[in-house]
């Protein structure tokens, strides 16, 4: 009796794993309505990119790398870049690529323009409200992914306190696979 129960439990467990895995892998109009997570990221470089960001020195391209975890693919590495206007603190043309370590799948994210408002009294900058983003495709099992959501960013102001901790981003939204 114990052997039959164990065999039945293993069979049911296997079917659940296969069903869940095949749904995500094949798409079948898979929707994750609880797409959320967070990452830490570090500044890599800044410089002019007139074609993308506009006239220098008012506009710069910024590049970052980092990693985090989310409810879609688990642990991921991330690279992203954006343009910024150094006079207004407007951040625009934000593009990110999250690569899931377990599968190698990538998800491409594009963010709406926003202002990263500095707080010199406490040496940080943050956006004032959730910034809209779009899921703009991907690779592997996430090829053709779509979706949307909102993100928040906080960052230390290194010139204010001399510290260089990673910046933080967290988000929530929906991701869909075709």
Q: What residue spans do the PLM features occupy?
A:
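Bacterial N-terminal signal peptides that target proteins for export
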Residues: 1-9
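Bacterial N-terminal signal peptides
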Residues: 9-18
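Beta-strand-enriched cores of mature, soluble protein domains
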Residues: 25-178
């Amino acid at each position: 009796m114990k052997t039959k129960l164990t065999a039945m439990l293993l069979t049911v467990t296997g079917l659940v794993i296969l069903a869940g895995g095949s749904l995500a892998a094949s798409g079948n109009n898979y929707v994750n309505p609880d797409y959320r997570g967070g990452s830490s990221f570090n500044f890599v470089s800044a410089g002019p990119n007139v074609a993308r960001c506009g006239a220098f020195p008012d506009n710069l391209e910024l590049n970052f790398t980092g990693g985090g975890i989310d409810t879609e693919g688990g642990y991921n590495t991330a690279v992203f870049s954006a343009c910024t206007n150094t006079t207004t603190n407007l951040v625009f043309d934000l593009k990110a690529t999250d690569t899931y370590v377990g599968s190698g799948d990538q998800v491409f994210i594009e963010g709406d323009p926003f202002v990263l408002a500095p707080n010199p009294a406490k040496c940080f900058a943050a956006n004032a409200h959730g910034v809209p983003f779009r899921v703009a495709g991907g690779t592997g099992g996430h090829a053709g992914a779509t979706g949307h959501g909102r993100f928040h960013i906080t960052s230390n102001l290194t010139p204010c306190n001399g510290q260089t901790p990673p910046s933080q981003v967290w988000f929530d939204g929906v991701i869909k696979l075709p």
